[in-house]
Structures are given as C-alpha cells and as structure tokens.
Amino acid sequence: MREMEYLEELTSRYPVLEAVKGDVLAAYEILRDCYAGGGKVMIAGNGGSCADSEHIVGELMKGFAKRRPVSGEFAAALKKADEKRGEELASCLQGGLPAIALTGHAGLSTAFLNDVNGEMIYAQQLYGYGKKGDVFMGISTSGNAENVMYAVAVAKASGIKTVGLKIGR
C-alpha cells in the first residue's frame, strides 16, 4: 500500500504528525475518494486561513511536485480545435484536481453580506456549488469560526464530506 509508505515518510519528516496519523490518513482517503468519483474540493477559512485556502487550490489545480500533462487525446483535440494555439495549449496546460476556494467571489460575498447574512457566505456557496461526493475543507486557527461551521452544517446536510484543519495550539 503506497499510501502507508507516504504516510510513514511524512511522519518521519514531521514527527509531530505522529499523534494525528490516523486523521491524516482519513483525510487523504476522503480526498482520494472524492476525486476518484469525479468530485471537487471546496476550501474556506478566514485571515491567514483564507490565504491557505487559495494556496491549496493553486497547488491542486496545476502540477505540484510533478507536472500533470494533458492526455494525448486532449492534446490532439486542442490542436484540431485551434491550429494556431493548440500546440502551445497542449504543452502548457496541466491536469488539475478540481478545487474552488470559497474565499474569493467578491461580488457574491458582498451581496450576500449586504442582503442576507455575511457569516453564511461559505454555506451559501456550498449550497450552490456542492453536490454529494464533493468535499468541503474548512481551515481555522481556533477551530470554531462560525462562518466555517455554518458551511460544515450545509455540507453534512448535502452529503458533502468534510475535512477540518485546525491550525493552532
């Protein structure tokens, strides 16, 4: 099982993770199953966790440690679709793992804040974007950010799995 090899390597490099090894494996399995089933990951947090959300999405939507080139079939389709740009697109595009940071979308966020309830903006986005089989990842330094917790409630009601990252003491 290659997953266990990676987990052992991770915990040997970062011994503090040994205490949450089972949680790390469970989070990995949730994400793996989401992507295997054609789902997407939606991520949110506040302040520094907002920046973390955007960063994680950036790594998922393009290659990270390894480049993820498009398939030969898609490269051929690009070249057929646009003789001028297809070759360049095929060489530059990378296979992404579908992910959305719920922390952007300024128009929606400010409209919902003004018209409804700003603490529920992540919940509203999950309700609109999410489907059963997707994953919501909530990031919080305290572990009890109310806007993230509203989103967790919507996720649970919608059959969206949740992964929580508490980044604090």
Features from the language model and the residues they span:
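Glycine/serine-rich anion-binding loops at beta->alpha junctions
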Residues: 40-57
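A short, well-structured juxtamembrane/interface segment
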Residues: 19-37
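Residue-level recognition of alpha-helical structural elements
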Residues: 20-24, 49, 156
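Hydrophobic alpha-helical transmembrane segments of small proteolipidic membrane proteins, enriched
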Residues: 12-15, 25, 40-41, 162
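Generic N-terminal amphipathic, Lys/Arg-enriched alpha-helix
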Residues: 1-19
